[in-house]
């Protein structure tokens, strides 16, 4: 059976793994998921990630990050979904928690944070909020 929203599946796997204090989480890999993991790593929300290939299927393994026993990611939620895409222009890209969190945006110049998209002067599809 095909998955209708693979990005939401990745975010749910991360959320569920952190609720039970897992150190790593695996999910089927794709270019967008790897780009999201790279943004999460650059922003300090995860320790790292790697793509593993077994018998032609690639898996994305994310190493989760904790501080004083609590997950670093307090909130991670999907914004744009297959049934309701959310596109924002460069001036309308939202701030998450007054700049304390990040919105991950996919733009013509790649997947990036809301701050980088504003600085670059591009808009795009708001994939998710992370705080």
Swiss-Prot record:
Domain of life: Bacteria
PROSITE patterns xref list: RIBOSOMAL_S8
Keyword set, alphabetical order: Ribonucleoprotein, Ribosomal protein, RNA-binding, rRNA-binding
A Pfam family hit: Ribosomal_S8
SUPFAM superfamilies according to UniProt: Ribosomal protein S8
A single GO molecular function term of this UniProt record: rRNA binding
HAMAP family associated with the record: Ribosomal_uS8_B
Stated family: Belongs to the universal ribosomal protein uS8 family.
Protein's job: One of the primary rRNA binding proteins, it binds directly to 16S rRNA central domain where it helps coordinate assembly of the platform of the 30S subunit.
The protein's name: Small ribosomal subunit protein uS8
Species, as recorded: Delftia acidovorans (strain DSM 14801 / SPH-1)
Primary gene name: rpsH
């Amino acid at each position: 059976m095909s998955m209708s929203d693979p990005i939401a599946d990745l975010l749910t796997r991360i959320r569920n793994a952190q609720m039970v204090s897992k150190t790593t989480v695996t999910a089927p890999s794709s270019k967008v998921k790897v780009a999201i993991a790279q943004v999460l790593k650059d922003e300090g929300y995860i320790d790292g990630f790697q793509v593993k290939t077994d018998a032609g299927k690639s898996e994305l393994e994310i190493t989760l990050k904790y501080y004083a026993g609590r997950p670093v990611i307090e909130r991670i939620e999907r914004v744009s979904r297959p049934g309701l895409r959310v596109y924002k222009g460069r001036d309308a890209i939202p701030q998450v928690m007054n700049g304390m969190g990040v919105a991950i945006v996919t733009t013509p110049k790649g997947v990036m944070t809301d701050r980088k998209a504003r600085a670059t002067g591009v808009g795009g599809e708001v994939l998710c909020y992370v705080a």
